């Protein structure tokens, strides 16, 4: 008799401890999963699961290529990228493609090439996905043992982990090679307002690179998000790439130690939960990085950070009122503190007013005006350059505070424009998606642990409480 639900609904997780189960196909009867449960039907069909993953990669790369070309088609060179709702072109520009001094776009052809290459790649991946999903072998273990696996085979799993780590390491080194040999990357700190340059003097000192990991995440410390020069970023990628590649080789050559065999759950769903947990961490870190860091995410392309827009406003009005005759060094604000300048808790001269909370901002347009004790009064009086005024006035009206209906900037700012900052989009999306992935991690970890411990999985469908309740209609 065909039941609407399967008694083996949660059975798949148990297959590790029961080698007798042979899956006949991809229907609910044989797998315990309906069509909408997606890849759960393919847990023991390595060939079909490969097809699903390759097809998924094809969709991802297709989106990248199509969205890339969409942004190129809509791009207006006269407007800054962050006013145009772009999220892909800023990444390409940061890598040094198509831009010149000050972050000005001088050539959109590299962006077009990037989009076309991704589209072509997606076609190859799409074909591979369809082939393995429909035509290729259901399982790889017999015909292609190198690509086959059994989820509970701990040695094979760490070998696969090692291969992934090596690929990640190669990815890190691709950025290093781009910065060192293939035209360089965009440096927002280059003198005169940012430029593309080759990174020649890498930071390889372990005390500096790993010092970032030991910093506090709060305030002026800012953990790894506080990195503010490209030498450290590219040097960090050398370290990271090396660690990933060496760790990958280690995991390929070794078998898991006894403590790891005991401590971890060795099932497909457990690996899924570990991966989701890692991606959640990545999402939360990426959120903080794109929101606060204006070196890895230059303000020329992504718009100013929140603290940067706030400090820019204070600077803009300091410039205006100083021209009108105000003595910015001694003017008193409504609270009795300095109106334009005041001292930080540690004694540096900082901007006064509400922006005092952002006193540890560092930005390329502001740093030339600092001395050994914070902002230098004589420089503020004599050395402010027109490009600094222009940059700060522009950033002041482009605070990353937009709402979904595109009323951008500070709500009370009469010069604000209809705009939502890419920083807002990227930070919010990565936080929200990171949170979803974290919930998925908890869900799948709980199921994997329950299966490993032999708990009852799910409620008994024959005596479900809802069956004894009055129908809604």
Curated annotation (Swiss-Prot):
Modified residues (Phosphothreonine): 15
Ligand binding ([CaMn4O5] cluster): 367
Membrane topology: Multi-pass membrane protein
UniProt key word Plastid: yes
GO terms of biological process kind: photosynthetic electron transport in photosystem II
Pfam annotation, one family: PSII
Top-rank taxon: Eukaryota
Cellular compartment(s): Plastid, Chloroplast thylakoid membrane
Propeptide residue interval(s): 1-14
Gene Ontology molecular function: chlorophyll binding; electron transporter, transferring electrons within the cyclic electron transport pathway of photosynthesis activity; metal ion binding
Chief localisation class: plastid
Family note: Belongs to the PsbB/PsbC family. PsbC subfamily.
Subunit annotation: PSII is composed of 1 copy each of membrane proteins PsbA, PsbB, PsbC, PsbD, PsbE, PsbF, PsbH, PsbI, PsbJ, PsbK, PsbL, PsbM, PsbT, PsbX, PsbY, PsbZ, Psb30/Ycf12, at least 3 peripheral proteins of the oxygen-evolving complex and a large number of cofactors. It forms dimeric complexes.
Protein name: Photosystem II CP43 reaction center protein
Organism: Solanum lycopersicum
């Amino acid at each position: 008799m065909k039941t609407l639900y399967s008694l083996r609904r949660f059975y798949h997780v148990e297959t590790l401890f029961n080698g007798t189960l042979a899956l006949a196909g991809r229907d609910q009867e044989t797998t315990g999963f309906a069509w909408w449960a997606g890849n759960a039907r393919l847990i023991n069909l390595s060939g079909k699961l490969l097809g699903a993953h390759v097809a998924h990669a094809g969709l991802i790369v297709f989106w990248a290529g199509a969205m890339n070309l969409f942004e190129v088609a809509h791009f207006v060179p006269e407007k800054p990228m962050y006013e145009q709702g772009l999220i892909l072109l800023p990444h390409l520009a940061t890598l040094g493609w198509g831009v010149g001094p000050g972050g000005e776009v001088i050539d959109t052809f590299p962006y077009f090439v990037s989009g076309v290459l991704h589209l072509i790649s997606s076609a190859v991946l799409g074909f591979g996905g369809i082939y393995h999903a429909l035509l290729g072998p259901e399982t790889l273990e017999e015909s292609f043992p190198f690509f086959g696996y059994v989820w509970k085979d701990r040695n094979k799993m760490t070998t696969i982990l090692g291969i992934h780590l090596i690929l990640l390491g190669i990815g890190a080194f691709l950025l290093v090679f781009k910065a060192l040999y293939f035209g360089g990357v965009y440096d927002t700190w280059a003198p005169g307002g940012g430029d593309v340059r080759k990174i020649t003097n890498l930071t390889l000192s372990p005390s500096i690179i790993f010092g970032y990991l030991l910093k506090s995440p709060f305030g002026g410390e800012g953990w790894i998000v506080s990195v503010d020069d490209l030498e450290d970023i590219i040097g960090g990628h050398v370290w990271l790439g090396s660690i990933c590649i060496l760790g990958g080789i280690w995991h390929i050559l070794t078998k898991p130690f006894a403590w790891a065999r005991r401590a971890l759950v060795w099932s497909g769903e457990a690996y899924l939960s570990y991966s989701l947990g890692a991606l959640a961490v990545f999402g939360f870190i990426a959120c903080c990085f794109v929101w606060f860091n204006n070196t890895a995410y230059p303000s020329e392309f992504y718009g100013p950070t929140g603290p940067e827009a706030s400090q820019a406003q204070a600077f803009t009005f300091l410039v205006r009122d100083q021209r009108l005759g105000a003595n910015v060094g001694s003017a008193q604000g409504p609270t009795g503190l300095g109106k334009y300048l005041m001292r930080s808790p540690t004694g540096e001269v900082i901007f006064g007013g509400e922006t005092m909370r952002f006193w540890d901002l560092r930005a390329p347009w502001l740093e030339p005006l600092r001395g050994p004790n914070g902002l230098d009064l004589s420089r503020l009086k004599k050395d402010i350059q027109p490009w600094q005024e222009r940059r700060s006035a522009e950033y002041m009206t482009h605070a990353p505070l937009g709402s979904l209906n595109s009323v951008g900037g500070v709500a009370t700012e009469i010069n604000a424009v209809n705009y939502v900052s890419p920083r807002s989009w990227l930070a919010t999306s990565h936080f929200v998606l990171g949170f979803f992935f974290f919930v998925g991690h908890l869900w799948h970890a709980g199921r994997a642990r329950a299966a490993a411990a032999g708990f009852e999985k799910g409620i008994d469908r024959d005596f479900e409480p809802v069956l004894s309740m009055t129908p809604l209609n």
